């Protein structure tokens, strides 16, 4: 793609997200979401491959449907209540419709079916943008409208997403489809705690972005698209294979890695709020996700591809454009757990 065109599209991505962040009026927020969607479509379709075009079409249709639902809900609220402010969403029909529309935009269960199919047709770098940056604007709106939404609906969507995010990845062999179930499960944890501790939701979102970026970048450096090709990683780059396994375990929420922090704090907060059953169900669904992360780790580190070469394995990475962000995100994805006391004091949990 022409660098000037790419610069304009990436600037539009940033503009759309910032516009939604800064909006207090539904129409401006909707415009920001639409700028975001229209800016990423050429980036998704730049490969000129039938799978990429199919993924782009599916993404456009789902995002257009969600945007139409948001516009319908905000117009209905303005008609019934007389308010266009995001914080003044009060009618039950409008709140439920907006919640379902935002769930569709984010890929939360039970309206998640488009996400694995879309990510399967994309390159890993574009998939990273879709899994991180494109989640920010809808999630900002969800945080703003969360106080007006029925808590039972939020908890149900959260638990269903954690279950689907773990269950859906069990029978997958394509890494991009497995990575698609990753945001479904993690965003489910965030929605679960959204009404009780918004600051904890923001912490979880930040760590999710760091860990997801690290996972996508390591797999892109490994040039792996299926579980079988992961077995060749150890002979190509042992250091990167070990780091990838640790990042995946962090995503699964195992101590002493960074991914354990948000799960631990969320379970603690749910118990404080008198929801031990929800906390237990969320912890049990996390085991499903952990199982397929362990499958990937097994393929990465315990399965060595038949190799008759006598050449020594390269332990040092070649310096490329993604080496620095890969290093930073990997360090943060692995070593932030000791900061938990400072984080809890800062968030006053």
UniProtKB/Swiss-Prot annotation:
Keywords, sorted A to Z: Electron transport, Membrane, Mitochondrion, Mitochondrion inner membrane, NAD, Respiratory chain, Translocase, Transmembrane, Transmembrane helix, Transport, Ubiquinone
Catalytic activity: a ubiquinone + NADH + 5 H(+)(in) = a ubiquinol + NAD(+) + 4 H(+)(out)
GO BP of this protein: mitochondrial electron transport, NADH to ubiquinone
Domain of life: Eukaryota
Disulfide bonds: none
Keyword Transmembrane helix part of the UniProt annotation: yes
InterPro entries reported for this sequence: Complex_I_Subunit_2, NADH_DH_su2_C, NADH_UbQ_OxRdtase_chain2, ND/Mrp_TM
Membrane topology summary: Multi-pass membrane protein
Family statement: Belongs to the complex I subunit 2 family.
Protein name: NADH-ubiquinone oxidoreductase chain 2
Gene Ontology cellular-component annotations: mitochondrial inner membrane
UniProt key word Transmembrane helix: yes
PANTHER family: NADH-UBIQUINONE OXIDOREDUCTASE CHAIN 2
Compartments it resides in: Mitochondrion inner membrane
Enzyme Commission identifier(s): 7.1.1.2
Segments passing through the bilayer: 3-23, 66-86, 98-118, 139-159, 178-198, 199-219, 240-260, 274-294, 319-339
Principal location class: mitochondrion
Coiled coil: none
GO molecular function, one term: NADH dehydrogenase (ubiquinone) activity
Function of the molecule: Core subunit of the mitochondrial membrane respiratory chain NADH dehydrogenase (Complex I) that is believed to belong to the minimal assembly required for catalysis. Complex I functions in the transfer of electrons from NADH to the respiratory chain. The immediate electron acceptor for the enzyme is believed to be ubiquinone.
